[in-house]
């Protein structure tokens, strides 16, 4: 896991000390190198995850749109069928009464 920003800043401030021993300077630089590697790795993982989720979201939007269109067509067909049923129930008596 990458270093927290405060930890990273502490290491950088430590490196500014001109009296810092070479071994400590090497260790601090190594920590920064490892931190950078883990940061890049985590960034790449998150980018891949984001791309995957974005693609899944797009697929779901398309599927949802298709379902809404299908439901809309089904509802319209039911309304048309109800209208047809109503028109078929008119009897001669109904016509004579009008």
Curated annotation (Swiss-Prot):
On whether RNA-binding is a keyword of this UniProt record, the answer is: no
> Known InterPro entries for this protein?
Gp7, Phage_phi-29_Gp7
What family classification does the UniProt entry report for this protein?
Belongs to the phi29likevirus scaffolding protein family.
Residues folding into a coiled coil are: 40-62
- Superkingdom, taxonomy of origin: Viruses
Q: Which UniProt keywords apply?
A: Coiled coil, DNA-binding, Late protein, Viral capsid assembly, Viral release from host cell
Please describe what this protein does.
Scaffolding protein involved in the icosahedric procapsid assembly. Coassembles with the capsid proteins to form the procapsid. The scaffolding protein is found within the capsid as a serie of concentric shells. During DNA packaging, the scaffolding protein molecules are released from the procapsid.
Assembly and oligomerization? Homodimer. Interacts non-specifically with DNA; probably binds DNA in the early stages of DNA packaging.
Q: Name one GO biological process term.
A: virion assembly
List, in alphabetical order, the Gene Ontology terms for molecular function in this entry. Answer: DNA binding
Fetch the Gene3D superfamilies from UniProt.
Answer: 1.20.5.400
Gene Ontology terms: cellular component: viral scaffold
Q: Which organism is it from?
A: Bacillus phage phi29 (Bacteriophage phi-29)
Q: What is this protein called?
A: Capsid assembly scaffolding protein
């Amino acid at each position: 896991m990458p270093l927290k920003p405060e930890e990273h800043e502490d290491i950088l401030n430590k490196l500014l000390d001109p009296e810092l021993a070479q071994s400590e300077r090497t260790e601090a630089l190594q920590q920064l190198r490892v931190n950078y590697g883990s940061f890049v790795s985590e960034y790449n993982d998150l980018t891949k995850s984001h791309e995957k989720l974005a693609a899944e979201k797009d697929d779901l939007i398309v599927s949802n749109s298709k379902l809404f269109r299908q439901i809309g067509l089904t509802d319209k067909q039911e309304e048309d069928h109800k209208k047809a049923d109503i028109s078929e129930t008119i009897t001669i008596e109904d016509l004579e009464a009008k």
